[in-house]
C-alpha cells in the first residue's frame, strides 16, 4: 500500500514552520476527532494519519530523517539504527498530540486540571457564587450590616462530606488504578479517555451516602450577615472566603462574591467621593443675595450663602460633606448648584411690579445688554 505524504496529510508545504505545522494539526485533529465523527470509519482513519504525520513533523530529528529518507526512516530497515517512528516498534500515538489534545478537547476529556486530568482529584473545591446587593446612598455613606439568604450547597452532615456511608474513605478506582484515565488501543493509535467508572476522580465510593448520594454535599439555603463598609459604590466587590458552594467529597468550599449596586438618590448625585445637589432659589434671592438651607448626606442641614447676582448653574462647595473613600483617604465634598426659578401663577400686583421692573432693568442686565448689542451689530452687518 502506498504511504501518504505527511506534509499532504496536514495540508502544509515542506518548508512550513513548526508553528504552521502545529496550527494545521490542531485544525485537522479537531475536524476529524472520533468523538465528533462517531461511526465514520473514514474520518477515524484520517484522524490516525493526521496524528501519525504530526508525531513525525513536530519532532526536529524525526522530521529531518523523514525529509531525507521518507517513510523508510521509520521502517527499521536502516542499517544505521535509524529512528523508529509512529509505525515502528514502541510507537505510541498518544504522545503525538498530548501537548495540544487536552487543549482542543479538554472540556469533554476532563483536561489536565480537571477531573479527567490524571492524578487523584477526589476532593474538589466548590464553585464560587455571586450575589447582587442593592444598597441606599445613606448605607453607602455610613456602612451597614445586611442579612442575606444564599441558595447553594453545604457539606453533607451524614457523611461529613466524604460521600461514603458512615463517613468511610473512598477507595482507589479498580478500572483506572487511581489515574482518572483509561487508555484504549486502536491499531497503532492510543486514545486516553476519562475513566467511565470514577468519572475521572481516581477513586470510587463503595457504599454511597444515602443522603447526598455520594456527592458529599446537599442543597441548602444559608443566612449570612454581610458587613458593608462605608464608601462602597456601584461595582464594588466584597469577597466572603469559604462561603460559596461546598466542595466535593470534603474539598474546600468556594467563595461568595457580593457585587454592590448603589440606588439612585432623590436629592444627591454621586461622582466618586463627591456629591452634587441642585438647589432651587427664587429670582429675588438670586438677585439680592440671601441664604438657603440644604440637607447633607449625614442627615444634617447646612446653611449656604447665596451671593448677590447669582445665576443658574453657579456652584458652591461644602468641604468634607461628601462620601468617605472606601479604603481611607478622607471624605469628599458636597457641591451645591443653584437653580434660579422663574415665578409662575403671578397675581395682578406681581405682574404690575415686574412690568415696572422690566422697564428700568436694562442697565442692570450686563449679559443681556451685551447679547442684544451683538444681535444689533449682526443685523447691521447683514444690511450692509
Swiss-Prot record:
<keyword id="KW-0862">Zinc</keyword>
<keyword id="KW-0963">Cytoplasm</keyword>
<dbReference type="GO" id="GO:0051085">
    <property type="term" value="P:chaperone cofactor-dependent protein refolding"/>
</dbReference>
<feature type="binding site">
    <location>
        <position position="209"/>
    </location>
    <ligand>
        <name>Zn(2+) 1</name>
    </ligand>
</feature>
<dbReference type="InterPro" id="IPR008971">
    <property type="entry name" value="HSP40/DnaJ_pept-bd"/>
</dbReference>
<keyword id="KW-0479">Metal-binding</keyword>
<feature type="repeat" description="CXXCXGXG motif">
    <location>
        <begin position="195"/>
        <end position="202"/>
    </location>
</feature>
<dbReference type="InterPro" id="IPR002939">
    <property type="entry name" value="DnaJ_C"/>
</dbReference>
<dbReference type="GO" id="GO:0005737">
    <property type="term" value="C:cytoplasm"/>
</dbReference>
<dbReference type="GO" id="GO:0051082">
    <property type="term" value="F:unfolded protein binding"/>
</dbReference>
<feature type="binding site">
    <location>
        <position position="212"/>
    </location>
    <ligand>
        <name>Zn(2+) 1</name>
    </ligand>
</feature>
<feature type="repeat" description="CXXCXGXG motif">
    <location>
        <begin position="156"/>
        <end position="163"/>
    </location>
</feature>
<dbReference type="InterPro" id="IPR036410">
    <property type="entry name" value="HSP_DnaJ_Cys-rich_dom_sf"/>
</dbReference>
<dbReference type="Pfam" id="PF01556">
    <property type="entry name" value="DnaJ_C"/>
</dbReference>
<dbReference type="GO" id="GO:0009408">
    <property type="term" value="P:response to heat"/>
</dbReference>
<keyword id="KW-0346">Stress response</keyword>
<protein>
    <recommendedName>
        <fullName>Chaperone protein DnaJ</fullName>
    </recommendedName>
</protein>
<feature type="binding site">
    <location>
        <position position="198"/>
    </location>
    <ligand>
        <name>Zn(2+) 2</name>
    </ligand>
</feature>
<dbReference type="InterPro" id="IPR018253">
    <property type="entry name" value="DnaJ_domain_CS"/>
</dbReference>
<dbReference type="InterPro" id="IPR012724">
    <property type="entry name" value="DnaJ"/>
</dbReference>
<feature type="repeat" description="CXXCXGXG motif">
    <location>
        <begin position="209"/>
        <end position="216"/>
    </location>
</feature>
<dbReference type="InterPro" id="IPR036869">
    <property type="entry name" value="J_dom_sf"/>
</dbReference>
<comment type="similarity">
    <text>Belongs to the DnaJ family.</text>
</comment>
<dbReference type="GO" id="GO:0042026">
    <property type="term" value="P:protein refolding"/>
</dbReference>
<keyword id="KW-0235">DNA replication</keyword>
<dbReference type="GO" id="GO:0005524">
    <property type="term" value="F:ATP binding"/>
</dbReference>
<comment type="function">
    <text>Participates actively in the response to hyperosmotic and heat shock by preventing the aggregation of stress-denatured proteins and by disaggregating proteins, also in an autonomous, DnaK-independent fashion. Unfolded proteins bind initially to DnaJ; upon interaction with the DnaJ-bound protein, DnaK hydrolyzes its bound ATP, resulting in the formation of a stable complex. GrpE releases ADP from DnaK; ATP binding to DnaK triggers the release of the substrate protein, thus completing the reaction cycle.</text>
</comment>
<feature type="binding site">
    <location>
        <position position="173"/>
    </location>
    <ligand>
        <name>Zn(2+) 2</name>
    </ligand>
</feature>
<feature type="binding site">
    <location>
        <position position="159"/>
    </location>
    <ligand>
        <name>Zn(2+) 1</name>
    </ligand>
</feature>
<dbReference type="InterPro" id="IPR001305">
    <property type="entry name" value="HSP_DnaJ_Cys-rich_dom"/>
</dbReference>
<dbReference type="Pfam" id="PF00226">
    <property type="entry name" value="DnaJ"/>
</dbReference>
<feature type="zinc finger region" description="CR-type">
    <location>
        <begin position="143"/>
        <end position="221"/>
    </location>
</feature>
<keyword id="KW-0677">Repeat</keyword>
<feature type="repeat" description="CXXCXGXG motif">
    <location>
        <begin position="173"/>
        <end position="180"/>
    </location>
</feature>
<dbReference type="Pfam" id="PF00684">
    <property type="entry name" value="DnaJ_CXXCXGXG"/>
</dbReference>
<dbReference type="GO" id="GO:0006260">
    <property type="term" value="P:DNA replication"/>
</dbReference>
<feature type="binding site">
    <location>
        <position position="195"/>
    </location>
    <ligand>
        <name>Zn(2+) 2</name>
    </ligand>
</feature>
<dbReference type="GO" id="GO:0008270">
    <property type="term" value="F:zinc ion binding"/>
</dbReference>
<feature type="binding site">
    <location>
        <position position="156"/>
    </location>
    <ligand>
        <name>Zn(2+) 1</name>
    </ligand>
</feature>
<feature type="domain" description="J">
    <location>
        <begin position="5"/>
        <end position="70"/>
    </location>
</feature>
<comment type="subunit">
    <text>Homodimer.</text>
</comment>
<dbReference type="InterPro" id="IPR001623">
    <property type="entry name" value="DnaJ_domain"/>
</dbReference>
Amino acid at each position: 500500500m502506498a504511504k501518504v505524504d505527511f506534509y499532504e496529510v496536514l495540508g502544509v508545504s515542506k518548508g512550513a514552520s513548526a508553528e504552521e505545522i502545529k496550527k494545521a494539526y490542531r485544525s485537522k485533529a479537531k475536524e476529524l476527532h472520533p468523538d465528533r465523527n462517531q461511526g465514520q470509519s473514514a474520518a477515524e482513519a484520517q484522524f490516525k494519519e493526521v496524528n501519525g504525520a504530526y508525531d513525525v513533523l513536530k519532532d526536529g530529528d524525526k522530521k529531518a530523517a523523514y525529509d531525507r529518507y521518507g517513510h523508510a526512516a521509520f521502517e527499521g530497515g536502516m542499517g544505521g539504527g535509524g529512528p523508529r517512528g509512529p509505525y515502528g516498534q514502541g510507537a505510541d500515538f498518544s504522545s503525538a498530540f498530548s501537548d495540544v489534545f487536552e487543549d482542543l478537547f479538554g472540556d469533554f476529556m476532563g483536561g489536565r486540571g480537571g477531573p479527567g486530568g490524571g492524578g487523584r482529584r477526589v476532593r474538589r473545591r466548590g464553585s464560587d457564587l455571586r450575589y447582587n446587593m442593592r444598597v441606599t446612598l445613606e448605607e453607602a455613606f455610613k456602612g451597614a450590616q445586611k442579612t442575606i439568604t444564599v441558595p447553594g450547597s453545604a457539606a453533607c452532615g451524614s457523611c461529613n462530606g466524604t460521600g461514603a456511608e458512615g463517613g468511610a474513605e473512598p477507595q482507589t478506582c479498580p478500572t483506572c488504578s487511581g489515574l482518572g484515565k483509561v487508555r484504549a488501543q486502536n491499531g497503532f493509535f492510543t486514545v486516553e479517555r476519562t475513566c467511565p467508572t470514577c468519572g475521572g476522580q481516581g477513586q470510587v465510593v463503595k457504599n454511597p451516602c444515602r443522603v447526598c448520594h455520594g456527592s458529599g454535599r446537599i442543597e441548602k439555603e444559608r443566612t449570612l450577615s454581610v458587613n458593608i463598609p462605608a464608601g462602597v459604590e456601584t461595582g464594588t466587590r466584597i469577597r466572603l472566603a469559604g462561603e460559596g458552594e461546598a466542595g466535593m467529597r470534603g474539598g474546600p468550599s468556594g467563595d461568595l462574591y457580593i457585587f454592590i449596586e448603589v440606588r439612585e438618590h432623590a436629592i444627591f448625585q454621586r461622582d466618586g467621593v463627591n456629591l452634587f445637589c441642585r438647589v432651587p432659589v427664587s429670582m429675588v434671592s438670586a438677585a439680592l443675595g440671601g441664604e438657603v438651607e440644604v440637607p447633607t448626606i449625614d442627615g444634617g442641614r447646612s446653611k449656604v450663602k447665596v451671593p448677590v447676582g447669582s445665576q443658574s448653574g453657579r456652584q458652591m462647595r461644602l468641604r468634607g460633606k461628601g462620601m468617605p473613600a472606601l479604603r481611607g483617604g478622607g471624605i469628599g465634598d458636597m457641591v451645591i448648584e443653584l437653580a434660579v426659578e422663574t415665578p409662575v401663577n403671578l397675581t395682578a400686583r406681581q405682574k404690575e411690579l415686574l412690568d415696572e421692573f422690566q422697564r428700568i432693568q436694562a442697565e442692570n442686565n450686563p449679559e443681556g445688554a451685551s447679547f442684544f448689542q451683538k444681535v444689533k451689530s449682526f443685523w447691521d452687518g447683514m444690511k450692509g
